[in-house]
Swiss-Prot record:
Main location class: plastid
Membrane spanning residue stretches: 140-160
GO BP annotations, alphabetical order: intracellular protein transport; protein secretion; protein targeting
Protein's recorded name: Preprotein translocase subunit SECE1
InterPro entries: SECE1-like, SecE_bac, SecE_sf, Translocase_SecE/Sec61-g
Membrane topology, from the record: Single-pass membrane protein
The protein's assembly and partners: Part of the Sec protein translocation apparatus. Interacts with SCY1 and ALB3.
Parts forming coiled coils: none
Keywords assigned by UniProt, alphabetized: Chloroplast, Membrane, Plastid, Protein transport, Thylakoid, Transit peptide, Translocation, Transmembrane, Transmembrane helix, Transport
Gene (name only): SECE1
Presequence range in chain numbering: 1-38
Cell compartments where the protein resides: Plastid, Chloroplast thylakoid membrane
Biased composition (Low complexity): 64-79
Pfam short name (any one): SecE
Organism: Arabidopsis thaliana (Mouse-ear cress)
């Protein structure tokens, strides 16, 4: 079985046209509509790339007809190589399946005792902050809670005194009777 491939040589250099490279008035706009301003050099590059692509296609067409007879294997070779590939694929599939079964049985053997040791291992891997930083942050949080509690209780006391003076000791139940 022989496989042959032909690759075209890499294209190097830029082809230049013999036209004047000064931009014409049609290419210059006072307020460009497109985000890309088209100049003569960009249009020349696009055209040269197009010509290069056409040349490569033509070369492949001429070279492709010569190499088609070499690249096309006979039907007897195809059937033999196809069976070999199927055997290789099935052997690889069997190896993968056996490895998966071994992994599954190994995981079942470890059982749930492995769970707690895994948790302990993960806790060890956590990057804990410094103890002093934790105490400082906790102190700030407790201070904010205590301060806001004092402020809210003071506002509640003042509003209760104000309502007692405005309504002269009458409660809510006195308004409905």
């Amino acid at each position: 079985m022989s496989l042959t491939a032909q690759f075209s040589p890499p294209v190097t250099g830029i082809t230049r046209s013999l036209r004047d490279t000064k931009p014409s008035l049609s290419n210059l706009r006072v307020f460009p509509v497109y985000t890309e301003i088209r100049t003569m050099t960009t249009s020349n590059l696009r055209k040269s790339a197009c010509f290069v692509a056409k040349a490569i296609e033509q070369r492949r067409d001429t070279a492709g007809s010569e190499s088609e007879s070499e690249a096309t294997p006979s039907p007897a070779e195809e059937s033999g190589s196809g069976e070999d590939k199927e055997v290789e694929i099935s052997a690889i599939g069997a190896e993968i399946k056996a490895a998966m079964e071994q992994r599954k049985t190994a995981e079942e053997e470890k059982g749930k005792n492995e769970f707690l040791s895994g948790v302990a291992e993960e806790v060890k891997e956590i990057e804990w902050p410094a103890f002093q930083k934790v105490l400082g942050t906790t102190g700030v949080v407790l201070g904010v809670i205590a301060g806001s509690s004092v402020v809210l209780l003071t506002v509640n006391f003042l509003l209760a005194e104000l309502s007692d003076r405005v309504f002269i000791g009458r409660g809510v139940q006195d308004f409905f009777s």
